[in-house]
Amino acid sequence: MQEYELKYGCNPNQKPARIFMKEGELPIKVLNGRAGYINFLDAFNGWQLVRELKKATGIPAATSFKHVSPAGAAVGQPLSDVEKKIYWVDDMDIEFTPLANAYIRARGADRMSSFGDFISLSDVCDKSTALVIKREVSDGVIAPGYTDEALEILKAKKKGNYCVIEIDPSYEPAPIERKDVFGITFEQGRNELHIDDDFFSNIVTENKELTEQAKIDLAISMITLKYTQSNSVCYVKGGQAIGIGAGQQSRIHCTRLAGSKADNWWLRQSPQVLGLQFVDGIRRADRDNTIDLYIGEDYMDVLAEGEWQKFFKVKPDVFTAEEKRAWLDKNTDVALGSDAFFPFGDNIERAHKSGVKYVAQPGGSVRDDHVIETCNKYGMVMSFTGIRLFHH
């Protein structure tokens, strides 16, 4: 197949639309459903991300994309009982394979943003991963292959219309890439980033102790940022992105946005949230939205008289600002990556509030000394990679 016709482009008024290869065949097969323009943008960016994560870590990887940026990305490290509970898989009687764990983590970190995602998997989709995907609201999935059982499960999703794409894992694009804007063609060399043992070796802080898990987490942050709309910042812990701030014009706003997402991820593991008693039959999306409101500033939207009864069997106590701060202070060993340099130490001050201990960024600001000084104040380890990772 050299060409795939699309119903429309980014918007319904943008017709005709297609994807095609000028030379050779497309490296994909659409096994089920029909993919759209944005679906393919998500799929091809996501596939590159998980392929590189697998290469860098040796662990199966998954990502959850929305509007051409990842809402989550992870490798398949084991899940704790608490993580299974906050990701709504504690009731599943399945084998938690590394690939299934990777998607559970990628989807679970920011469930509000991942609603209606496009999934990318680094490895052949197995039955367990397909069963996890089956119960989530999602537009489609791309993977290098599917077991017969997995494909049967996925084909039944969305009344038989779920988009399933198989990509040739041996496909390599040309070293030069092009795109047209306003009738003008842009051309550039592909952004080739290779993470190895020396990538984070230029440590500029007093604390130079970088653990093996920290190296994995920093690698996840760098590769995730490579495929996130800039400016972007990514918090990672335990093999998964826990907060991604994408597409902001200000670096500090990226750090705050991603930090607030990381905080929400950690607050969901608090006794206050784990103890919530939801009404029977509440939908998964409503449960996610209720928790998001409960731990946020608009908590009275779900705690006011006449409202809480819609969501809870028992009215919860208010999760006070003091209680939330006390719980957030228990979060430690978080890794933070930035697609460009931090211009001021305020980014590090904000990162500290979300438990950051490890930082990777290109360096090169005229205020590098201030940023390093702020890291030293909190005993952080910071690496200057020398590589900017803008993505547009």
Question: What is each model feature region?
Answer:
Residues 1-196, 214-232:
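Active-site loops and adjacent core secondary-structure elements that bind or stabilize anionic groups
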Residues 56-64, 164-167, 230-237, 267-278, ...:
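Flexible, glycine/charged-enriched surface loops at secondary-structure junctions
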Residues 22-34, 109-115, 189-208, 285-307, ...:
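Gly-rich Lys/Arg/Thr-decorated short loops/hinges at beta-loop-alpha junctions or inter-strand turns
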Residues 71, 117, 121-122, 135-165, ...:
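C-terminal binding/interaction regions
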Residues 202-244:
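Internal active-site segments that recognize and position negatively charged phosphoryl groups
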Residues 69, 125, 237-240, 248, ...:
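Active-site-proximal loop/turn and secondary-structure-junction residues that shape catalytic pockets
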Residues 71-112, 242-341:
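Glycine- and Gly-Pro-enriched alpha-helical subdomains that act as flexible
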Residues 52, 227, 264-268, 353, ...:
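Conserved helix-loop functional segments at active or binding sites
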